[in-house]
Structure formats: C-alpha cells, structure tokens
C-alpha cells in the first residue's frame, strides 16, 4: 500500500508465469534458474539488500539478496546453498549494489524475534562489484570473508574482488 500510495508500480511475483528460465553456464551446482522477467528485461539492475543475519547463510547481503528474484529457491537450499548463490552471481551481476545497513538485524535473522535483534549501525555500502560489496559488509559483523562461504567461493572463482586491500574504499561521514 505504501509503495502504491507513493506512486510506485508494484510488480507481481506470486506465480511462476512471471519467471523465465535462464542458464548458468559457469555454474558448478546451479545450471539453470527461473528469474523474474522484470529483472531480465531491465536496462539497469540495482540491488538494494538490507544487511542482516540469516540462519542458513550466516549473513544476507547483496549476493544472497538475489535469491529474491528466483522462483525455486528450494532447489538452492537442497543442492548446496552457498555454491548456488555464488553460481548465480556468474549469470548477471547487478549494475549497482546499495547495502542498507542503517538498522541491522544482528541476530535471529532473517526475520528476528524482537526489536532487541536490531541495532542502529548507520552504514551504507555502495559498489558496482557485488563480491566487494559483500566482503566489506562482513566487516560490520566482525566476520572474515572465508566465514561466509558464498562470498569466499565467488571471490575464488573471480566473480569480483574479495580482498578489501585491493579496493579504493572511500568512507564518508554524514
């Protein structure tokens, strides 16, 4: 309702007919997936994940957020979730990733059980490199990249930069 009231177009995603099969040629476990047609038809793809913990992947950041564009996420969970996430990144990377880490779910993600699970962090991470985006966001939780398997896999496969020392990072204080 809020989106419609603000003038946004709300796209349906509740039935399989809105998804088209894509092949993942470089995929190790994920060879194909059904991706939402509006993502496939877009000229520019901007990924805006909310940083949070997740019981299956430790963290949800930019790469994990792409699962929201997929019809059969259950396949990923049954067939090596971290590898499938990394495989999908080889298909099409967003043009821009903007991680909302203003209020961060620090525990009990992805849904949380109380407001005590959320902390005010006041961060935003912006990059055109999805692996670098996720690598930087892991530091907010004090994690190393190799602790989040899909980030480690994607970095090792060359899908982006996972070594923060190789990046030109600009920190802005507002």
Task: Specify the residue positions occupied by each region the protein language model found.
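N-terminal and secondary-structure boundary signal
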Residues: 1-174
């Amino acid at each position: 309702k809020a989106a419609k009231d603000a003038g946004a177009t709300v796209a349906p995603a509740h039935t399989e007919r809105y998804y088209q099969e894509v092949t993942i040629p470089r995929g190790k476990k994920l060879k194909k997936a059904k991706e939402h047609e509006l993502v496939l038809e877009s000229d520019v793809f901007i990924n805006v994940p909310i940083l949070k913990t997740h019981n299956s992947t430790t963290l949800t950041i930019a790469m994990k957020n792409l699962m929201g564009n997929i019809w059969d996420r259950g396949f990923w969970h049954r067939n090596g979730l971290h590898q499938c996430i990394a495989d999908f990144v080889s298909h099409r990377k967003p043009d821009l990733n903007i991680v909302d880490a203003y209020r961060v779910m620090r525990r009990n993600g992805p849904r949380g059980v109380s407001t005590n699970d959320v902390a005010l962090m006041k961060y935003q991470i912006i990059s055109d490199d999805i692996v670098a985006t996720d690598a930087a966001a892991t530091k907010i939780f004090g994690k190393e990249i190799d602790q989040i398997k899909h980030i480690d896999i994607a970095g090792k496969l060359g899908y982006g930069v996972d070594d923060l020392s190789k990046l030109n990072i600009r920190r802005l204080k507002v």
